[in-house]
Amino acid sequence: MRLLFMALAISVGGISVAGQAIGAPMVAYRVVDGGIPIALTEQPGDATRGRDIATNRQVGLCQLCHQVPGSTDRFQGDIATHLSGAGTRWTASQLRLRMVDSRRVNADSVMPAYFKIDALHRVGASWRDQPILNAQQVEDVVAWLVSLK
């Protein structure tokens, strides 16, 4: 039954399975003044979905490095900035660039590029040419981060 569900989810396209955006099309974006000012999707991001993605240990995995405000999960990370007040510290444009490719902001960042498929290192064959999150998932997480005031 579980395999049937996974097959159905994959056939829908753009569904995240084990943290990978299966069948996610890449969209062009432009970096301007340290951010990506234009959303990756026409549909606005949904903050509730964004929080679900960020706190899911099989999808966003943000809590591996960050502490998430309001989360009761044990073993949240402390090697990256606490996400409280993210919407006050950064604009949606800046947050979008950090999600898409954090190394464009800080070349030494260990944060994965969630919406990048080229110039990556040590990517398993089954995960090549696929972003970690699809464009809508990135926009959802950005909407959630912006809401953290």
Name the predicted role of every residue range.
Residues 1-36, 149:
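N-terminal export/targeting leaders of redox proteins
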Residues 24-57:
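Electrostatic cytochrome c docking/interface patches
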Residues 40, 44, 53, 63, ...:
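Gly/Gly-Pro-rich "capping" loops immediately C-terminal to redox-active cysteine motifs
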Residues 46, 91, 133-137:
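An acidic site on a long C-lobe helix of protein kinase domains
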Residues 57-61, 69, 137:
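Short pre-active-site segment immediately N-terminal to redox-active cysteine/selenocysteine motifs
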Residues 63, 112, 135-142, 146:
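Short, well-structured alpha-helical segments
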Residues 66-69, 145-149:
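Protein kinase-like catalytic domain
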Residues 125-132:
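Periplasmic OmpA-like peptidoglycan-binding domain that tethers envelope proteins to the cell wall
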